Structures are given as C-alpha cells and as structure tokens.
C-alpha cells in the first residue's frame, strides 16, 4: 500500500535499513517497524523515539489521526497545511490511513474517495484503530494491491477496482514513490 506525502510536502522523517532520508520530527505521526518485524504507530518523541529501537524502518506523515483510542483534536481544526488537499485545494478527496489496534497486533488500511479528515477519523475509530496516521491522498496516490501468483508470475489486484486501477502493478517494480508491503510469515 501507498506511503505518505513526498518530502517536498512536509519534509517528514524517514529511515530504512539504517539510512536516514530525513530526520524525525518531534510530535509527528510515525510508523516504526522494529528489527524484529513488530509494527508500532505513535507520536515521535512521546510514543516512539530513537532510543526505542532498533528499527528496521520508520516513516512519518502529518499528525496522528487517532491517539490512544481518541480522535486527535487537530482532525477538526487542522487546515490543508496540516492534512493536505487536492491540487484544486479541496480537503475532501481520496485519502488513506494506517491504524493499529491497542495491542499492536492488527493493522488497518483505510481508504476511499471523498473523505474529509473527520470522516477518515470516524472510519478509523469504527475499526478500533488505537493509533493511526495519514498516508497519501488524492486518487493517483491512494492505492492498495494484493499480490497473488498465476503461472509463476506475480499479479497485482487492487483493493478497490474503481479508483485504484491506475498502474495496478506499481509495487512490483522500482518506484520513485515510497510504499509498504506486508508478508505472511510461514
């Protein structure tokens, strides 16, 4: 599934494999993947920090949408500068988010068209996302694909056939945009 905003749209921190693309920003929503594969979502400096590693990777984007089971007040007071907007300045647009349950065991990917931040937060609280962060926005960038094998070759299938049908196989090749992948353990 898709990553977050480009560096030019917030300069949010990112690190993978020990290589820091941008330093972490205090107070921003962060997804961290531990060296053991454990996933955590929280606020950098409060829930997560450099001393909490070792991390295989971490990525920041905007502020937390839900924090400790409650909707962040910024969801209702934030502007396009906080949460992003379409090229036309619309704050109701395709949006995606990643949430995690209170026990850090279940990840939730939430996405859809015509979402305001309050609507996205409502969807995340409906699935009991204890902590959650905004990922990318706008139709071209909100994307989730499941990969299956047919005749020995990987085939990508979009989560939502309408709206996620552009460049369906984008996660099967090199990309200038960041993304996450989840693999089942054997």
Question: Predicted segment positions?
Answer:
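Gly/Ser/Thr/Pro-rich low-complexity, intrinsically disordered segments
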Residues: 1-186
